[in-house]
Amino acid sequence: MAESVFAERIVQNLLDTDFYKLTMMQAVLHNYPNAEVEWEFRCRNAEDLRPYLAEIRYQIERLAEVEVTADQLAFLERIPFMKPDFIRFLSLFRFNLRYVHTGIEDGQLAIRLRGPWLHVILFEVPLLAIVSEVRNRYRYREVVLEQVGEQLYRKLDWLSAQASSEELAEFQVADFGTRRRFSYRTQEEVVHILKRDFPGRFVGTSNVHLAREYDLKPIGTMAHEWLMAHQQLGPRLVDSQQAALDCWVREYRGQLGIALTDCITMDAFLDDFDLYFAKLFDGLRHDSGDPLAWAEKAIAHYRRLGIDPLSKTLVFSDGLDMPKALQLFRALRGKINVSFGIGTNLTCDIPGVEPMNIVLKMTACNGHPVAKISDAPGKTQCRDENFVAYLRHVFNVPA
């Protein structure tokens, strides 16, 4: 009998999240425990999600029952940069549902988070996974686990046929597919197959629970929210990116050294990414805009600073599939180290299934707006157009 891809309970443990949520949470605990934030859900492809509201609410309510286990805490304790006070905090942490607000606004599903950053930070990934899986249960209930494996093996066979053994030995891929996965079981099957049969170098997964289950490295450093929040955490707006990077350096002392570049655009980021940061951080992550043009800018920036690009790593994570990743790998091989985080194309690529394009983004910090401009116009998210205009002015970003 074919095995279903759905489980009755969507999020079953606290570690079923992206690793960078925990790394940022620890930094928030140590540096901004009293910061207040607001988040807002958006479905970018305007799909009507109202019919699923009751089931989404039910699954959110079940998050309140989730708590970390002793074995999970022991796994985190083995990570050198996870501090004892943060581990103790996690042992006491529970999802507090008073910070989550769901309903219908302007004819669309609305989800908002409002509360202490420290206590709402872990909601983002489970909420997105819940919305995605609930919707998929209704629309694609006939999908079975075998289809997931068949589709993935087609990609692995293609890669084996296209790339030489020398290329495959250097071709690094990680699973970044938690938030928009078809279902939890789908992601688990993908990670299981990649660990066993990926022809290149499968370097890990962003999902902490699956990293623990499959003895993989949990992958991730910071997300946009880290840089966005600093727009309202005290420093002058023009200094906010450097303040975010500096706080990260002080927190992790050389660990977790991949910086995200597109909160306000790559050009604005590089203006702030001086010799100090370029030496301290191991590399950069691309998440919007033309990836090759972005990479060439990064390489040129390192060279201008007198840094050998081959001592640094570029991580690509924007809408990748195997052909795009291989194309980038070949274009940049010998110029700089590269690694690829593939998400939706691994965990929600099933024939006949349309993946969701959903986000849950921070919109305010300490009662004031924050924004992401990015290197792709469609990824800008902020209700306050005046603040976006001011942000563009401060960082010299054309409208």
UniProtKB/Swiss-Prot annotation:
Its EC number is 6.3.4.21. Transiently phosphorylated on a His residue during the reaction cycle. Phosphorylation strongly increases the affinity for substrates and increases the rate of nicotinate D-ribonucleotide production. Dephosphorylation regenerates the low-affinity form of the enzyme, leading to product release. InterPro entries: N/Namide_PRibTrfase, NAPRTase_N, Nic_PRibTrfase, Nic_PRibTrfase-Fam, Nicotinate_pribotase-like_C. GO terms for molecular function: nicotinate phosphoribosyltransferase activity. Pfam families: NAPRTase, NAPRTase_N. Keywords: Ligase, Phosphoprotein, Pyridine nucleotide biosynthesis. Pathway: Cofactor biosynthesis; NAD(+) biosynthesis; nicotinate D-ribonucleotide from nicotinate: step 1/1. GO terms for cellular component: cytosol. The modification Phosphohistidine is found at residue 224. SUPFAM superfamilies: Nicotinate/Quinolinate PRTase C-terminal domain-like (SSF51690), Nicotinate/Quinolinate PRTase N-terminal domain-like (SSF54675). It catalyses: nicotinate + 5-phospho-alpha-D-ribose 1-diphosphate + ATP + H2O = nicotinate beta-D-ribonucleotide + ADP + phosphate + diphosphate. GO terms for biological process: NAD biosynthetic process via the salvage pathway. Gene3D superfamilies: nicotinate phosphoribosyltransferase. The keyword Ligase applies. It is an enzyme of class 6 (ligase). Belongs to the NAPRTase family. Catalyzes the synthesis of beta-nicotinate D-ribonucleotide from nicotinate and 5-phospho-D-ribose 1-phosphate at the expense of ATP. PANTHER family: NICOTINATE PHOSPHORIBOSYLTRANSFERASE. This is Nicotinate phosphoribosyltransferase 1. It comes from Pseudomonas aeruginosa (strain ATCC 15692 / DSM 22644 / CIP 104116 / JCM 14847 / LMG 12228 / 1C / PRS 101 / PAO1). The gene is pncB1.
